[in-house]
Structures are given as C-alpha cells and as structure tokens.
Regions:
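A generic secondary-structure signal
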Residues: 22, 48-55, 82, 116-120
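Reductase modules of NAD(P)H-dependent flavoproteins
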Residues: 63-169
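Short, flexible active-site-adjacent loop segments at beta-strand->alpha-helix junctions, enriched
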Residues: 20, 39, 135
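FAD-binding FR-type
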Residues: 1-35, 48-51, 96-97, 154-169
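Active-site-adjacent beta-strand anchor residues
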Residues: 35-38, 131-132
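Hydrophobic structural packing positions in well-ordered secondary structure
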Residues: 11-14, 45, 80, 130
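Hydrophobic/small residue at the entry helix of a nucleotide-binding pocket
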Residues: 40-45, 137
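Conserved S-adenosyl-L-methionine
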Residues: 30, 52-62
Length: 169
C-alpha cells in the first residue's frame, strides 16, 4: 500500500473505503478481552480500546500484546502508555530488535506469552480474543484468515483450547 501511494502523481485519484465496522461491540459484552496485534494491525485494536476507555461504565479488562520490529515502530505509544494508568488496561510490547535497556518483551509473541498474559480459553463467553497483523503472524496465532471470512481457528489459540466463537481475526 505504501509503495502504491508513493508512486502516485499529482492529479492521480485514490479511493478509500471505510470505516467498515466488522465486530459490533457492546459495553461490558465480555469480562476480559485479549488482543494480539502486529505493526499496523494495531489500528482496529485502537478503535476498540479507545471505545472501551472512553466509557467509564465499561468494566471490561483489556490486555494487548503488541509486536513491532523496533521501539520506534510502536504506533500510538504515548496513548498506550497513558492507558497503562487505567487498571482496566494491560499493554505489553514485544520487539524483534530491542535496545539494551528495553523493559518489555522480546521476540515474537509465543504460545507461552499468550498463555501468560491473555484470558484463558476456559473463560468461555466471558472472554474474547482479537488478532490483527501480518498474515504470517495471524496464521501462527489464530490460523489463516480467508478473504472476507474468519477461517478456521488454528495456531497457538487452538493449541490453548480456544474455540472459533472466542476469536475474531
């Protein structure tokens, strides 16, 4: 997408669509939400996080596992760091190339990290997991997403016992 936009010339037309709501969230719909995002996959997560944060009556606990290559790549960092002050939110950063003084997690988001930080599959309807990121990450965590469809549950989340109805990718 970025290279396409970069190749545009003055006067070229660019069509946008959206926003297109894909998950109709209701306040307090879940007790806990787990989110796994990679890179620009943070965009839909931010929309839901911002919605929950702006509703003080929404008691949903949200944990975000957010992976990037470098610390400079973390989008919305100031907003997420501010949200850490709200007890409803837990934000955990993962970096592939972490600086020496890095306090967050390193490497890819693993099965162990998902199990450590996110709600458990046994929570059933009380918890929900959202996944958005590069296709290899989504496939590894939740199984492949089919164009316009969720696709079957797979990857780490299936190994941890999650069912399709508990996951949105």
């Amino acid at each position: 997408m970025t290279s396409y936009i970069g190749d545009l010339k003055p006067g070229d037309k660019l069509m946008f669509k959206g926003p297109i709501p894909k998950f109709p969230y209701k306040s307090n719909q879940f007790e806990e939400i787990g989110m796994i995002a990679g890179g620009t996959g943070i965009t839909p997560m931010w929309q839901l996080i911002d919605h929950i944060a702006s509703d003080k009556n929404d008691k949903t606990k949200v944990t975000l596992l957010y992976s990037n290559k470098t610390e400079e790549d973390i989008l919305l960092r100031e907003k997420f760091d501010e949200l850490k002050k709200d007890p409803r939110f837990n934000i955990v950063y993962f970096l592939d190339k972490a600086p020496k003084n890095w306090q967050g997690e390193t490497g890819f988001i693993s099965k162990e990290a998902v199990d450590k930080y996110l709600p458990k599959a046994e929570a059933g309807e009380k918890a929900h997991i959202f996944v958005c990121g590069p296709p290899p990450q989504v496939k590894s965590i939740a199984g492949p997403k089919v164009a316009g469809q969720q696709g079957e549950i797979g990857g780490v989340l299936k190994e941890l016992g999650f069912k399709s109805e508990q996951v949105f990718k």
